Amino acid sequence: MRKEFLLVVFLIGLLTKATIAQTQAKRIEKVYTNPLKVQLGDPFVLFAKGTYYMYGTGNPADRGFSAYSSKDLVNWKPEGQIYAYNNKNGWSDPNTPWDGAYWAPEVYEVKGRFYLFYSAQWKVNPAKEMENFKIGVAVSDNPTGPFVDLAPKPLFDPGYPIIDANVFFDSDGKSYLYYSRAAYKHPVESEIASHARKSGKYKEIEESWVYGVELKPDFSGVKGEPVLVLRPPVKLKDKQAAWESLSVTTGEVNRRWTEGSTTFKKGGIYYIMYSANHFGGEHYAVGYATSRSPLGPYKKADENPILHKNTDRGGIVSGTGHNSIVYSPNGKEMYCVYHGRTTTTGSERVVFIDRMKVENGKITVYGPTTKPQKMPAVSPNGK
């Protein structure tokens, strides 16, 4: 009898250990760690048909764009190439610098169809400009393509190179395109430029600026003239000058950037997040500005930058920027999706996803993180 009792106790013990081990395993499964296993720059995430789709700049696409899919925002499956330059309405030239500069794709679902906004080198280039970037729009019946350009030409030509398209759909039915005027051949005088000249760093400073313009409902063009929305600070005493000018003041390059914008609206306030400094350097970082109108004027936040490198604080992440925004599967949690680099990934841009919140008119991004984080919530109760 005693032996039988001991055997029962032993078996219960084994069962308890197994249950504990399974519980611990489940707990381990409910966390994730940055960076994700996706090598892309300028990541944009769309939620459609119950699935997340990620688009971005870089491999494995060949002169175009590829996509990834996920159910939980963490584990991503390659979906292959979704857009190629040589579709029947292709207007770009892959035989140009940066292999055609197929950059920063963003996809939006409108009335059951999917629209891809992107930038590339326009083949109409009589002046042989090195940076002849324009923005195009392609369409597909599926988020994974194939996408075909709406027309055999860019969306519009403002007369200067443009990149980093972002579209905001307002509650009144209007839609707006935000883009970055490339810094190429755009020297700008400022106190920062004057200081760089006097210190012997650079003779001139080129700048990229963010513009906004209303889109035609069918995305065949724009309505009215573009409006300047954001630019680097002019005065040295400006609160934003120090962090937005690091590419210049550290001797990295003679350019200042305002690019990679993403716009959303909450509580009647328009928020535009943007990236500053050289995308290839350690100082690439994210700030934001607010307005009561989609085309401004916008006021930059005093607490900028809200997402930047942590290598100066004992971390391993730098070059954080060009973000998009997405919500968890249960729609409750807000996430910032962005690219960065780590001391182990080197020069390759990899994708990060970190929680963010908007409270009392202020944006907070809880990143960059590289330690285990709780998985995005799936159920309504946050689990």
Descriptions of predicted regions:
Residues M1-A25:
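Bacterial Sec-dependent N-terminal signal peptides
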Residues Q22-K383:
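Carbohydrate-active catalytic/glycan-binding domains of CAZyme proteins
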